[in-house]
UniProtKB/Swiss-Prot annotation:
It is found in: Cytoplasm. PROSITE patterns: HEXAPEP_TRANSFERASES (PS00101). Pfam families: Hexapep_2 (PF14602), THDPS_N_2 (PF14805). Belongs to the transferase hexapeptide repeat family. The keyword Transferase applies. GO terms for biological process: diaminopimelate biosynthetic process; lysine biosynthetic process via diaminopimelate. One of its GO terms (cellular component) is cytoplasm. The lineage of its organism: Bacteria, Pseudomonadati, Pseudomonadota, Gammaproteobacteria, Aeromonadales. This is 2,3,4,5-tetrahydropyridine-2,6-dicarboxylate N-succinyltransferase. The keyword Amino-acid biosynthesis applies. Its EC number is 2.3.1.117.
């Protein structure tokens, strides 16, 4: 455990006594350092190590402590004023800083301090919360929301109105993760620490939480909390045990590899789900 982590862990144990006026200098400096590490992408709440996702809970604790040490303050916008504890990521950026970051931010897209936006990323009018990590080549489309501490991989497309859940409380919960090369269709919601594995395609209007049954029609297997790599998923339903009604489910209609996905294209994959 690093010294920074030790300070954060100790501060979190006494979090109820920490206020903007009472926080000691060493604790405040540690919290700000942790937020800067998240903001720069040098640290992230979750990362894949040896093929498994590892969650760094102490960084989530640092985010929660950040709220404890900040007073609300005015945040200026072009046409309005806002009042919050967390400043905006790009509020003081110059044209040179935007060029160096390699990101496009379309008004009125909002990213909070403590989120990381990698190069070659496009933020249409959307929202990225504190602690989130958005990797290279990703498109966050109009009115999409990337929740606190969510992890978005490389070359992901979050379509219009998509919601990726944030998980700061309960603290033991894992962040929602969208792995590399995934497509999330318009108005879909992925929440509660669900992992959408690499190369998956989620159709429009699919809702997936930890309790959602994810049914593979080819094998009959039911998954919870995880969409297997290369899955093409649509909204559907499964019959109840008594056969009197059906309940919502996400249905894996096919599996595709990277070569097929690149050759065929997203629309063709979704149009041919009855094949």
């Amino acid at each position: 455990m690093t010294e920074l982590q030790q300070i954060i862990e100790a501060a979190f144990e006494r979090r109820d006594s920490i206020t903007p006026g009472s926080v000691d200098a060493a604790t405040k400096a540690a919290i700000l350092q942790a937020i800067d590490l998240l903001d720069s992408g040098k640290a992230r709440v979750a990362e894949k190590i040896a093929g498994e996702w590892v969650v760094h809970q102490w960084l989530k604790k640092a985010v929660l402590l950040y709220f404890r040490i900040n007073d609300n303050g005015i945040i200026k916008g072009d046409d309005a004023q806002y009042y919050d504890k967390v400043p905006l990521k790009f509020s003081d950026y110059s044209a040179e800083q935007f060029k160096a970051a390699g990101v496009r931010v379309v008004p009125p897209a909002t990213a909070r301090k403590g989120s990381f936006i990698a190069p070659n990323t496009v933020l249409m009018p959307s929202y990225v919360n504190i602690g989130a990590f958005v990797d290279e080549g990703t498109m966050v489309d109009t009115w999409a929301t990337v929740g606190s501490c969510a992890q978005i991989g490389k070359n992901v497309h979050l379509s219009g109105g998509v919601g990726i859940g944030g998980v700061l409380e309960p603290l033991q919960a894992n962040p929602t993760i969208i792995e590399d090369n995934c497509f999330i269709g318009a108005r879909s919601e992925v929440v509660e620490g669900v992992i959408v594995e690499e190369g998956s395609v989620i159709s429009m209007g699919v809702f997936i939480g930890q309790s959602t049954r994810i049914y593979d029609r080819e094998t009959g297997e039911i998954h919870y909390g995880r969409v297997p790599a290369g899955s093409v998923v649509v909204s559907g339903s499964l019959p109840s045990k008594c056969g009197k009604y059906s309940l919502y489910a996400a249905v894996i209609v096919k599996k595709v590899d990277a070569k097929t996905r690149a050759k065929v294209g997203i629309n063709a994959l979704l149009r041919s789900i009855d094949e």
